[in-house]
Regions:
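C-terminal non-catalytic interaction modules
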Residues: 1, 8, 337-411
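Short alpha-helical DNA-recognition segment
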Residues: 14-33
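DNA major-groove recognition helix of helix-turn-helix/homeodomain DNA-binding modules
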Residues: 42-59
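Short C-terminal boundary/hinge segments that cap the last helix of small helical domains
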Residues: 54-70
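Tandem amphipathic alpha-helical repeat scaffolds
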Residues: 69-80, 108-120, 146-161, 183-199, ...
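Helix-turn-helix repeat elements of alpha-solenoid scaffolds
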Residues: 78-92, 118-132, 157-171, 199-210, ...
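Amphipathic alpha-helical segments of tetratricopeptide repeats
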Residues: 90-98, 130-138, 169-180, 209-220, ...
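Alpha-solenoid helical repeat architecture
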Residues: 101-106, 140-149, 179-189, 218-228, ...
Length: 411
């Protein structure tokens, strides 16, 4: 512990000058060295200085040990993703920030505050916290430097600054031996997530498997589920259907047992994607219906699931009139061109193949390309390629097929 910093904290709190505090005990220059942690004073000197301020030094040591234990619990709750407990400890620690600033606990506390803000999705405070940490970096220990590399990487990814995240990851790999073992699983997970975002599903699978293995050995069961979900999504994108199917079933069961509602919902959605890829549209439809019932109407996520339900219903020849009516109500309220295009698309499905294909070719496909809706554009390109090939128009079929594959997943 930094005795001098704590001594200075209490001196300032008691509104004492250095001369007033050290009179008859030691020289002002010696007190200055103590307060700047340049020298370790004798026990007698420490006791006399604290007694002058009415503080029992032994009790102060016990107080320090208590706060050290709380900071360590804050760290462990963060590592093991116990967000409720982390928030409880954060509230307690935040009432003693002035004291913590005077101790050698401050770096670790401030580092994990950034991770706490990321978990809370409080990006303004997270951004502010990164600025604070930059100013503190010169005082970081090697361990704290290793921790900071991973937490900064998380910040870049949460901020969707993926280019900077990739650059940071390259720098991290140059100092791999300096990443604490406790953070290796997190580093593997973040790297897998970043590679997945870049559609490099093969490499992402490799690091997701490493994250799963690390979290399993570390008994980090909540983070294990997160890594398993990412792994199952990668398996889906690589058409490893049996591995993905088994993993999704495990994730859904464990997420439900553990009361992890958000993760359960994410697993439901991604399992439905797998089922649609396998042609099991009825199963996918049932999963999406279950998910939709869990969501708050009016949210962006609810809207996205409604659209996926419509796509699934159309693929599985499932009645979708009520879903179209619901999308119509949302479209009228929002007056969003994207939703208007989708609404017309689903309505044309119920009229004729020719009218649907004309609308897709003349309106929907150009609109989705222009506004960057690549997933929707690829879906329509695939349908148009099949349509033109069925009527012998191979030239157009090849054009749409080329777009579909060029914009496809880099597996």
């Amino acid at each position: 512990m930094n005795i001098g910093s704590i001594l200075k904290y209490y001196r300032m709190r008691n509104d004492l000058t250095q001369a007033e505090l050290c009179k008859g005990i030691c020289s002002i220059s010696h007190l200055s060295k103590i307060e700047s942690n340049k020298t370790i004073p004798r026990t007698e000197t420490i006791n006399e200085l604290f007694q002058r301020m009415g503080i029992d030094w032994e009790r102060e040591v016990a107080t320090y040990d208590d706060w050290k234990e709380k900071v360590e619990s804050f760290v462990m709750h963060s590592v093991y993703y116990d967000l409720k407990s982390m928030e409880e400890v954060y509230i307690e620690l935040s009432t003693q920030e002035d004291y913590l600033q005077s101790t050698d606990l401050v770096n670790r506390y401030e580092l994990y505050k950034l991770r706490y803000y990321l978990f809370k999705r409080d990006m303004p405070r997270a951004t502010q916290q990164t600025s604070i940490l930059r100013r503190m970096e010169s005082s970081f220990t090697d361990y704290e430097k290793g921790v900071s590399k991973v937490i900064y990487l998380m910040y870049d990814i949460f901020s969707q600054n993926f280019t900077e995240a990739e650059n940071r990851l390259q720098r991290i790999e140059q100092y791999r031996e300096r990443i604490p073992m406790l953070f290796e699983g997190e580093l593997f997970y973040q790297k897998a997530y970043l590679l997945h975002n870049r559609a490099q599903y093969g490499r992402s699978t490799y690091f997701a498997e490493m994250a799963v293995d690390h979290f399993l050995k570390d008994c980090n069961y909540i983070r294990l589920l997160h890594a398993q979900l990412l792994l199952a999504i990668n398996y889906t994108n690589r058409d490893f259907t049996m591995q993905a199917d088994n993993l999704f079933k495990t994730i859904l069961r464990n997420a439900k047992i553990m009361g992890m509602d958000e993760l359960y919902q994410g697993a439901l959605y991604n399992y439905s994607v797998l089922q649609n890829r396998r042609g099991l549209h009825k199963s996918a439809y049932e999963m999406l219906c279950e998910l939709k019932a869990l969501l708050e109407p009016g949210t962006d996520y609810y809207q996205a699931i409604l659209i996926h339900l419509l796509h699934t219903a159309s693929e599985g020849n499932i009645e979708m009139d009520s879903l179209i009516e619901e999308l119509d109500a949302i479209t009228k309220r929002k007056e969003d061109p994207y939703l208007m295009t989708l609404l017309t698309y689903f309505r044309k499905m119920k009229i004729s193949q020719q009218e649907l294909s004309d609308f897709c070719e003349q309106t929907a496909f150009p609109f989705f390309i222009k506004h960057g809706y690549i997933g929707e554009a690829r879906s329509i390109a695939w349908k148009l390629a099949n349509y033109h090939r069925s009527i012998g128009n191979d030239g157009k079929a090849d054009t749409y097929s080329l777009y579909y594959y060029e914009k496809g997943d880099d597996q």
